[in-house]
């Protein structure tokens, strides 16, 4: 990958990023509408088009019901997925929401819903858009919590959850490079204000890192 954090990702680089999953029968993409996941969907679609044979791609957006804008963002993802010739589904986290621990509860619900779609679709993997920035934040969070050596290993490129594989093809890529890729392609993306809400731990650490 290029050393310049602001260089757009090329088709050949995308093929390398996703090569581990060339032989998967089907893959679910978790797409929220933010820059990281939109870039994931865009790059995965280009990768798949470059293959003679490859996995079926299914884009899935989870609306957690926590923000009014989420439904509009899900519709925008659906429009882009249609333009990329990808099937898309929007799932909703229904029921009462907890008063505390919302991010963790939302994350657990999201993975549960995504895994359900994966199993129903015959997909072996769920691709998530975790980046190098996310990896750094995760390491810092675990360090501050006093995690041992195992905890400090942070996120793996691939791990199992809810009976399917979670794959993180962008784990070595900085967010800035994904944004540059979308800007070059003139693809819009959503801005989730909760990512800057310092009432939550990760945004607070993100502000310190920046």
Task: Label every model-predicted segment.
Residues 2-208:
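Core alpha/beta nucleotide-donor-binding catalytic domains of modification enzymes
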